[in-house]
Design a protein with these regions (language model features):
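C-terminal alpha-helical cap/extension of soluble enzyme domains
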Residues: 36, 47-139
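Catalytic alpha/beta core domains of metabolic enzymes, predominantly
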Residues: 1-77
Length: 139
C-alpha cells in the first residue's frame, strides 16, 4: 500500500482530475482510506451492488458499514479465487461463478480450461452461501 499511497499523493498534487483505482479488491477499503477512488474488482462482475455500496458508504463517512462490506468482499475473494492449484484460479473462479449466475459462458481461451464438474459444484454451493450473506446486508 506504500506505492499506492505515494501514487495517491502525486495524483492529488499534480493531476487531481485523474481517478486512482486499485486492482486487488481485498484492499478496496484501504485504498479508499488513503485517497483512492474505487477499484477494478473481479467480484464486481458477480455482485456489483456490494462493491458500489462499499464505495458509497465510505464516501458518506460510514466507515463501520464500509468495513462490514469489505469483509463480505474478502469472503467473495476467499470463496472463488482460490479454488484449484493453478494461478488461473482467480479467472476460473470468476468465469465459473458468472456462468452459474447466467452472466456468461465459462469457456476460457487456451491455455486455460474451465473448472471440472466437482469444482463447478463447489462454486455453486459457495454462490448460494454468499448470496444469502449479502441478502442479510440489507441494501
Amino acid at each position: 500500500m506504500n506505492y499506492f499511497k505515494a501514487a495517491a499523493e502525486l495524483i492529488k498534487q499534480h493531476r487531481p482530475d485523474w481517478p486512482l483505482l486499485i486492482g486487488p479488491e481485498e484492499k478496496l477499503f484501504d485504498s479508499l482510506q488513503i485517497g483512492g477512488h474505487g477499484g477494478v474488482s473481479g467480484g464486481a462482475n458477480l455482485f456489483p451492488k456490494l462493491y458500489v455500496k462499499l464505495c458509497e458508504a465510505h464516501r458518506a463517512g460510514n466507515l463501520a458499514r464500509a468495513q462490514e462490506l469489505q469483509k463480505q468482499i474478502q469472503r467473495v475473494s476467499d470463496s472463488f479465487y482460490r479454488i484449484g492449484k493453478y494461478s488461473s484460479s482467480i479467472i476460473k473462479g470468476i468465469k465459473c461463478a458468472a456462468s452459474c449466475l447466467g452472466i456468461c459462458d465459462d469457456f476460457m481461451a487456451e491455455p486455460f480450461h474451465r473448472f471440472r464438474a466437482g469444482e463447478r459444484e463447489l462454486v455453486k454451493t459457495r454462490l448460494k452461501e454468499i448470496e444469502a450473506e449479502i441478502a442479510k446486508l440489507n441494501f
